[in-house]
Regions:
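A short acidic/glycine-rich loop-to-helix N-cap element
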Residues: 291-304
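Intrinsically disordered, low-complexity acidic/polar segments
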Residues: 282, 294-296, 319
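Beta-lactam-recognizing serine transpeptidase/beta-lactamase-like catalytic domain environment
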Residues: 1-53, 58-289, 355-365
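Short, gly/Ser/Thr-rich active-site loops of penicillin-recognizing serine hydrolases
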Residues: 207-209, 303-365
Length: 365
């Protein structure tokens, strides 16, 4: 778990890594305090945000569980859906939509109209109930202070709320909620209370404290879990997340591009949530770049978070002794089409990652 910008624990009030001296000199006392609080805040648990398309696996899993969609079912995306007077667009709106696609292709290509269709078929009450089942709107119980609950509509959900929630807008979550929900979707349906430390041992090897895996509840069946793993694997192999692929390993996951409020400011939050190995998960990763501006040396678009996710996995998997697959897929090095291009936003990019070890999850072969 990490956030950037960060601070030196030996000099926690040093803002020089984030602000120029001129900016610091101009700060009022309140501005200075707020800058410190912002720097010290653990984004992964204490900040909530609209997740965007990384929420789509939750929508799809809920719909599969309720039987409102089956593997192979198709829906026609014309580039938008009308909810009353509101036109909710797909990211390929300008080209006329995705056409008739399967549910797997909807995940691979991040189709909004298909997700809206699923939410409407579920109905407001059931969709809200599944959000609660996956842990949204409540704390995860992680052993860190200051966890936010996020914001959900619950029994006040309207049709337009459900439609927007289906692709991760107008719902606020924290990173650990998303990570916990995602892990339950791909590990066979088991939602666990997350912990930072598994065990504390003394210098002579005695166990001082041990956090045993605590099962909270089951969210989905094994059959739904296997389908989502397949869909998410396809998303990395041939869908919107091709840039995350790591040579020699099977990786699965979902991209996200969320427009921040107020919408008129045209600011974005881009993300990737995924796991490896794809068919037998050992690790999950969640990476966010808040308001990308290209200062990482790339484009300031959703490609940035995919490159960062790839780089993390490329180092993480061999370091944690995860064996390569027998067949090594080719890593996509071309320019994959982004869900959105997000250029020209102000400075202040924040990169956040949350990674969870799934070694103690039940076998899901």
């Amino acid at each position: 778990m990490a956030s950037y910008p960060t601070f030196d624990l030996n000099s926690p009030r040093d803002l020089s890594g984030v602000y120029t001296q001129e900016q610091i000199d101009k700060m009022s006392d309140d501005d200075y305090k707020n800058a410190l609080y912002s720097l010290w805040t653990n984004y992964c648990v204490s900040e909530s945000y609209e997740p965007g398309s990384t929420f789509k696996p939750v929508t799809v899993a809920s719909a599969l569980e309720e039987g409102v969609v089956k593997d192979g079912d198709t829906y026609t995306c014309n580039g938008y859906e009308m909810i009353g007077p509101d036109r909710l667009k797909c990211h390929v709106y300008s080209s006329g939509g995705h056409g008739t696609i399967t549910i797997e292709q909807a995940v691979m290509n991040s189709c909004n109209p298909y997700m809206i269709h699923l939410a409407l078929e579920l109905g407001n009450e059931k969709f809200a109930a599944y959000q609660s089942l996956f842990g949204f709107g409540k704390t995860t119980g992680i052993d860190l202070p200051g966890e936010t609950m996020g914001i959900v509509y619950g029994n006040k959900m309207t049709t337009i709320d459900a439609a927007c929630n289906s692709f991760g807008q107008t719902i606020n979550v924290n990173m650990m909620q998303m990570m916990s929900a995602y892990c339950s979707i791909i590990n066979g349906g088991m939602l666990y209370q997350p912990h930072i430390v598994k065990r504390i041992e003394s210098a002579n090897g005695e166990v001082v404290k041990e956090n045993k895996a605590t099962l909270v509840r089951q969210t989905v069946t094994m059959s739904t879990s296997k389908l989502l793993r397949r869909y998410l694997k396809s998303t990395v192999e041939t869908g919107t997340a091709k840039k995350v692929a790591v040579t020699g390993y099977s990786v699965a996951g979902k991209t996200g591009t969320a427009q921040k409020s107020p919408r008129s400011e045209n600011k974005w939050l881009i993300s990737f949530i995924g796991h490896a190995p794809a068919d037998n998960p050992k690790f999950a990763i969640y990476v966010i770049i808040d308001e990308p501006d290209g200062t990482t040396g790339t484009s300031g678009s959703s490609a940035d978070v995919l490159t960062l996710s790839h780089d993390i996995l490329e180092k993480l998997l061999p370091y944690m002794s995860v064996y390569k697959d027998s067949l090594e897929p080719e890593t996509d090095t071309g320019t994959a089409e982004d869900e959105y291009t997000v250029d020209g936003v102000p400075e202040g990019s924040i990169q956040n990652t949350a990674t969870e070890n799934l070694q103690n999850m039940p076998s899901i072969n």
